[in-house]
From Swiss-Prot:
EC annotation from Swiss-Prot or TrEMBL: 2.1.1.-, 2.1.1.367
Keyword Hydrolase: no
Taxonomic lineage from the root: Eukaryota, Viridiplantae, Streptophyta, Embryophyta, Tracheophyta
Protein name per its UniProtKB record: Histone-lysine N-methyltransferase, H3 lysine-9 specific SUVH8
Residues of the Pre-SET domain: 528-578
Annotated ranges, domain Post-SET: 739-755
Domain YDG: 310-448
InterPro entries: H3-K9-MeTrfase_plant, H3K9_HMTase_SUVAR3-9, Post-SET_dom, Pre-SET_dom, PUA-like_sf, SET_dom, SET_dom_sf, SRA-YDG_sf
Region (Disordered): 62-98, 111-243
The protein's role, per its UniProt record: Histone methyltransferase. Methylates 'Lys-9' of histone H3. H3 'Lys-9' methylation represents a specific tag for epigenetic transcriptional repression.
Enzyme's top EC category: transferase
Gene: SUVH8
Catalyzed chemical reaction(s): N(6)-methyl-L-lysyl(9)-[histone H3] + S-adenosyl-L-methionine = N(6),N(6)-dimethyl-L-lysyl(9)-[histone H3] + S-adenosyl-L-homocysteine + H(+); L-lysyl(9)-[histone H3] + S-adenosyl-L-methionine = N(6)-methyl-L-lysyl(9)-[histone H3] + S-adenosyl-L-homocysteine + H(+)
Amino acid sequence: MVSTPPTLLMLFDDGDAGPSTGLVHREKSDAVNEEAHATSVPPHAPPQTLWLLDNFNIEDSYDRDAGPSTGPVHRERSDAVNEEAHATSIPPHAPPQTLWLLDNFNIEDSYDRDAGPSTSPIDREASHEVNEDAHATSAPPHVMVSPLQNRRPFDQFNNQPYDASAGPSTGPGKRGRGRPKGSKNGSRKPKKPKAYDNNSTDASAGPSSGLGKRRCGRPKGLKNRSRKPKKPKADDPNSKMVISCPDFDSRITEAERESGNQEIVDSILMRFDAVRRRLCQLNYRKDKILTASTNCMNLGVRTNMTRRIGPIPGVQVGDIFYYWCEMCLVGLHRNTAGGIDSLLAKESGVDGPAATSVVTSGKYDNETEDLETLIYSGHGGKPCDQVLQRGNRALEASVRRRNEVRVIRGELYNNEKVYIYDGLYLVSDCWQVTGKSGFKEYRFKLLRKPGQPPGYAIWKLVENLRNHELIDPRQGFILGDLSFGEEGLRVPLVNEVDEEDKTIPDDFDYIRSQCYSGMTNDVNVDSQSLVQSYIHQNCTCILKNCGQLPYHDNILVCRKPLIYECGGSCPTRMVETGLKLHLEVFKTSNCGWGLRSWDPIRAGTFICEFTGVSKTKEEVEEDDDYLFDTSRIYHSFRWNYEPELLCEDACEQVSEDANLPTQVLISAKEKGNVGRFMNHNCWPNVFWQPIEYDDNNGHIYVRIGLFAMKHIPPMTELTYDYGISCVEKTGEDEVIYKGKKICLCGSVKCRGSFG
C-alpha cells in the first residue's frame, strides 16, 4: 500500500444531534486514514459527507447556543476511546457524523471558551502518543470512508449548520432543531447586560436573567430601563376653568340647589348659555361646553341635585335642551355619559334599583310605534351581547315596580342635536333580540302616561310643517301668507280657537323695515365714529362695539345699552336680514292674536325687528295698542355672563340697562310686521335690544331688535315685556305698578298691569 501524506480529517457533530465527544486530534485522524487504506473489505458504516475546507477557523464551527455540551474531549477520555476502537475488529455502530477535510487547521481556535465546562484543548504531545499507539496495533479497526461527494469552496459554504441526525446529505442542510433562529457559527463576544432600574420591574414577575421579552406578570408596556419622572403640566394661563371662587354668589340657596323651581331652572340654563356664548366669542380653543358646565357645577350653579322618580320641579313637558350637560345641571337626567339614569337600591327605598329617566340619542335601534309609545334599546354590547346589569337591570326592575320614567327624545335640527322632554312613561315589557350588529340586545317597551301636555308630538307636527309646508289643510287655517310676499318665508294665519271665525287682523300695511315720519332719530353719536379706520371688511362694527363683534354664529352674545350695526353689505348686521324663522300668527284664547314659531329657538337668536312708524310724543295717539316706548319701566333681569364663571374680574361685567339719550317711540298700528302681534308677559321669553343703524348716508337711527331670552320650544307663544308707565312706592320694598291695561299673562311674576 502506498502511504499517503497525513491529511487532517475532523469529525463534527451538529450541536442539535445530541452530546458530542468534541474534536479529534490531528495525529489521531492520520492514523485512522492509514488504517482505512490498508483495509481490503471495509465494514459497513453509514455514509458520511466529506468537505474540503481551506483556512477554516474551527472556532466558527461550534454554536454555544446549541444546547448542553461537554466541550472538547479531555485527553484521557480521548485516549481511552481510541484504544477501544483499535481493539475491536468490527467497529461499533455510531450515529452518522459529518467528516470534514481541513487544511491549515489551528487547534487553538477549535472550541468556544463560553460554551460551558471544558477540559481545554488536547495537548499536542499527548496526541503524538495516541498516534504511535495506533500505528503499533496489529489489527487496526476497519473504518469506511465514503467517496467524496461534494467539494465546495468555503466562500460558498456560508457556515450553514447541518444536522447529523437528518441522514445523508450532499450539502448543508436546513437549520436543525434546538438552535435559536438567526444564530450563526461565528465567534461571539460576550454581551454586557444593559443597566436597568430594578424599581421599574414588578417583583411578582419572577426572577429574570437580563433584558428579554416581557414575561407573564410584568405590567404591560413596562420595560427594563430607567425612566425619567414626568414633569407636571404647568397651569395654562389662558385657561377658563374655575375650580373654586370664595367670593362668588350663586344666588341659589342650599334648599333650591336640592329642589328647584321654574325660575331657578330658567336662570341656570341662561347663565350656562351665557358662559358658553362668551367662550365662543373669545374663540376659546378648548372644549367650550365642558368648560362652561364644569364651572357652573363647581360654583354651585345647579339645581334638583336630589335624585327622584317622577317629574322634576321647574322642568315642563316640551322643554328643549341643546346640550346634554344642560339636563344634568337642572336634574332632569343626572347620568353624564349614559342614556339610562337610575336610583340605587339604598336611594329607591326598596330592594333593587329603579330607572328614573332615559334619553334617546338616535345612535341605537330605538323605534317609535306611535307618538305615545317608545321601543328603547338597552345599553352595552357591540361587540358583545348586552347583559342585564346597571341601566338595563334598572329598566327591567321598573317593569315589575311600575314606576314612572322620564323620557327625553333626541332629534336632529339643522345638523344640531336637540333634546325634547316628552313627559312620564311606564316600562311595560322587556325582551331580547338580535340587533343589527349580530349580538343580543335588550328591548324595553315604554308607554306614555295619559293626561300630559304634548311634547314630542308637537315636534313631529312642526317637522311636517317645515318639510312639507302643510298649511292649507291645517285646522283653523285662514291665510297662507300674512306678509303678502314681503318676507322671504311665508307667515301663515290660523285660528284654532274658533274655526268658524275667518276674520283677519285689523287693516294695516305690512313693512319689513322701519319707517320714519320725515325725521332723523339722532342719538348724538360722536361724529368721529363715522370716520374710523376699517377693521372688518370696510365696517367699523368692532371698534364701535368695544373691540368685539356682538354676534357669534348669528347669536347675540351680550345685552348692551346700545349695539352698533353698519348698513350696506356689512356681514355682521342682523336687523336688515329679515325673517329667518318660520313664524305664524295665531288666535289666543284670551289675548287676541299672538305670534309663535315652527322652529326651536336657541337663546340669543334674533327673531324679528319691531317695525312701524317712528313718532314723537305729540304724534302718539292715546288709544294706540301697538306702541313701543323705550321710556317705560321694565322689569330688570340678568342675561349676560358672569365674569367669575370665566376667571375674569367682576369689574368687567357688561351693563345691560338701556341708556338711550332720547326716547324712542314706534307705532305699529297702521304699518308694521309680525312683531306687532307679539303679546305682553311679565315673565317673557323674548327681550328687546336697541340697535344703532347707519344707513351710510350720514343718518343714524335706533331700531329695536327682538331676541330670544332662553331656549324656546316650537309652537310656544313669543312674548316680551311691554313695561309700565309709572310706579308708586308704598314702602321701602313695596311698589304699586300703574299700567294702562290689565295684565292677563298668568305668570308667577305677573304685575297685574302693563302699558
